[in-house]
A protein has these predicted regions:
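Hydrophobic alpha-helical segments
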Residues: 217, 358-458
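Short aromatic-rich membrane-water interface segments that cap or initiate transmembrane helices
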Residues: 87-100, 162-174, 370, 376-380
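Membrane-interfacial loop-to-transmembrane alpha-helix junctions, especially the N-terminal start
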Residues: 1-7, 50-63, 134-139, 194-205, ...
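Hydrophobic, aromatic-rich transmembrane alpha-helices
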Residues: 36-44, 177-192, 389-401
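Hydrophobic, membrane-inserted alpha-helices
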Residues: 10-17, 37-40, 206-214, 230-234, ...
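Membrane-embedded catalytic interface detector for glycan/lipid assembly enzymes
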Residues: 22-27, 80-89, 108-243, 247, ...
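Small-residue-enriched transmembrane helix-hairpin modules in multi-pass membrane proteins
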Residues: 258-390
């Protein structure tokens, strides 16, 4: 049934695309939302039945709704309480941009449904052969990296205020921590697949995770923490115990509220690096009480990227397409500084200059970075055809790795799962960095160092 419903959704979305009005129309936006809602519910029911509640689409589909539909249907035109919408936006393009996004998600669902594996087990633990030497080495290196970060932030106090600390290095750190959790999971005995087993088997990993997360939350950096926690959610659910919906839902609600507070305070004088927790909390409460819409303010990080969808479409119509220059960096992500070097070599531009977030910030004449939108980013590079093809391929990829047949497929799924709520407000290849680091560190942690004692015994 879900297959026929998805095909029907593709057809409805295609017709709606050609009928999209040339100015804002709330009835049209509501129609798009309703058709997506019906198709999305059927699709999610199918995916959860196959995979359980902890799967990529459980988070990806609702996030896609919030980012691309909420503003057009529920917020516009009273949107000035959201700072990015105070900058110029071509609101006439809202229906067209929304129809482009809907075409994209329809083709994502189609690719996902058509290429699902025949194995319909709702739960499967991949078992990989990981030497104990690699397990211990990865845990110790992860702990050393996290402890060094903790000292840098809390003891030396070299990070003050809202900062993104060396993003590439932090991505390496969190990839190491997640890989260490995966390695440890390969050593489990039958009696270890429970909460107690998780605690006993991951003492060093838990310390590493706490040090890493505390350091970043203290300076208001949430992204890398979210990436890591989603990876761990997947691993814990797969290897230790099934996470129940009654536990997941309140955790998500509390997490959204906390992240909303952090979003409000992190760029103010009341971030945690400058004031204590209670002062920061009081400031956040005051801002929320003064807001005309508490819900959307707490969800600011999700709903504001609708603007970059509209702006991305507008930019492409005004200035033409980027023809993939924004994606050159991902061809060389495995090389240190490779992305920036080859982007400059092949395009003549710095890496920041080809990033759609940077381009759209200048296009809107904004005074701070606006970020990007996955669909808008693809549209800026390859037009509607690119949106359809790449979203279809993304759906295909998720369908093939959600039941991983090898550790490499699991690494790809971990990288995607880390980005399950971020991907919609980023570019479609942003998960590749994690995947490449998993491959590199997997190899490094397995290198066998021949000691003098071993040489003598030989």
């Amino acid at each position: 049934m879900v297959g026929y419903a998805t095909i029907l959704f593709v057809l409805f979305s295609t017709v709606s695309f050609f009928l999209a009005p040339t100015t804002y129309s709330k009835p049209f936006c509501v129609w798009e939302m309703v058709t997506f809602g019906l198709a999305g519910v059927l699709f999610l029911q199918h995916k959860i039945r196959r995979n359980g509640i902890i799967c990529f689409d459980t988070f990806f589909i609702p996030t896609f709704f919030l980012i691309n539909y909420a503003h057009a249907v529920f917020i516009y035109p009273d949107d000035e309480f959201l700072p990015p919408f105070r900058f110029a936006t071509n609101t006439k393009l809202i229906p067209y941009a929304l129809s482009v996004a809907q075409m994209g998600i329809a083709f994502y669902m189609l690719g996902n449904i058509l290429f699902e594996r025949e194995n319909t087990e709702s739960f499967r633990r991949l078992k990989a052969d990981i030497p104990e030497m690699a397990v211990n080495r990865c845990a110790l290196v992860s702990l050393a990296a996290s402890f060094g970060l903790f000292v840098f932030v809390f003891v030396l106090r070299l990070a003050n205020g809202f900062e993104h600390l060396y993003p590439r290095l932090m991505t390496m750190f969190l990839s190491l921590i997640a890989l260490s959790w995966f390695f440890q999971a390969q050593q489990l005995l039958p009696e270890d697949h429970n909460f107690k087993g998780m605690l006993l088997r991951n003492k060093l990993n838990i310390i590493s995770t706490l040090l890493f997360c505390a350091s970043h939350l203290y300076i208001g950096s949430r992204g890398v923490v979210i990436f890591l926690l989603f990876m761990l959610l997947l691993l814990i659910n797969n290897y230790y115990f099934r996470v129940k919906f009654k536990v997941l839902l309140p955790t998500i609600v509390v997490g959204l509220i906390l992240m909303g507070f952090l979003a409000i305070t992190r760029v103010s004088a009341y971030n945690l690096a400058r004031v204590d927790f209670m002062e920061s909390l009081q400031y956040g409460l005051e801002v929320i009480q003064e807001s005309p819409s508490i819900l959307w303010l707490l969800l600011t990080d999700f709903v504001v990227n609708a603007k970059t969808l509209y702006d991305g479409v507008d930019y492409a119509h005004v200035n033409g397409y980027l023809m993939g220059t924004a994606y050159v960096q991902y061809l060389f992500v495995f090389l240190p500084m490779g992305g920036s070097y080859f982007t400059k070599l092949l395009t003549g531009l710095d890496m920041d200059e080809v990033r759609t977030g940077y381009i759209l910030t200048r296009f809107s004449e904004a005074t701070y970075g606006l970020g990007t939108n996955m669909v808008g980013d693809i549209y800026m590079n390859f037009s509607l055809i690119g949106v359809l093809v790449l979203m279809f391929l993304l759906g295909l990829l998720v369908a093939r790795v959600e039941f991983p047949a090898s550790k490499y497929a699991l690494y790809a799924y971990m990288a995607l799962f880390a980005n399950c709520i971020y991907l919609v407000r980023a570019d479609i290849f942003s998960w590749l960095t994690f995947f490449v680091f998993f491959l590199i560190f997997d190899w490094l942690m397995r290198i066998h160092i021949v000691t003098y004692a071993e040489t003598v015994s030989d």
